[in-house]
């Protein structure tokens, strides 16, 4: 059992090291995109399923409340947080539309959609991205594996942050770390620390 624990930690560390080498440019571009959207008076919508839903909610909470330091609230909304809306849409046998309908209702040109999917093939996330494109939103996609269908929907103005792994658990771990990096970059760009 102790060896298995060490394997889990080692795999996680190796995935983080690979991500640290491969992803800084994409993470930086995503943060700049989000900052520009916020400075223009827009908002960030985010969505995911399962563990990715938790990551989306964490991002929105960090924007609205704070990340590591006190600052004004920033407009972000997790589309998977409203169970009434999600179950209302699902009860009409439109599960694939649970995020797309919300994007069409709430998304405005200049907003950002943070779409999180470990394999990039979740139908409801794909449809949310398609809806965001029709609303002239930009997209930040957190993916893994080969990026799936989601990667093929992105335009040159969008950013894919693809975790270099083929294990969902490792991908989700680095998605959370990536969200923390985005929050840190957004905060430090909009509200630079005096002691930096």
Swiss-Prot record:
> Is Metal-binding set as a keyword in this record?
no
UniProt keyword list? DNA replication
By its UniProt entry, which InterPro entries does this protein fall under? Answer: DiaA (IPR023070), GmhA/DiaA (IPR035461), SIS_dom (IPR001347), SIS_dom_sf (IPR046348), SIS_GmhA/DiaA_subfam (IPR050099)
Q: Look up keyword Protease and say if it applies.
A: no
**Any idea where the SIS domain is?**
34-196
Listed GO molecular functions? carbohydrate derivative binding
Q: Name one GO biological process term.
A: DNA replication
Subunit record text: Homotetramer; dimer of dimers.
Function of the molecule: Required for the timely initiation of chromosomal replication via direct interactions with the DnaA initiator protein.
Family according to the record: Belongs to the SIS family. DiaA subfamily.
- PANTHER family listed in its UniProt record: DNAA INITIATOR-ASSOCIATING PROTEIN DIAA, SEDOHEPTULOSE 7-PHOSPHATE ISOMERASE / DNAA INITIATOR-ASSOCIATING FACTOR FOR REPLICATION INITIATION
Query: What protein name is recorded for this chain?
Result: DnaA initiator-associating protein DiaA
**Species this protein is from:** Photorhabdus laumondii subsp. laumondii (strain DSM 15139 / CIP 105565 / TT01) (Photorhabdus luminescens subsp. laumondii)
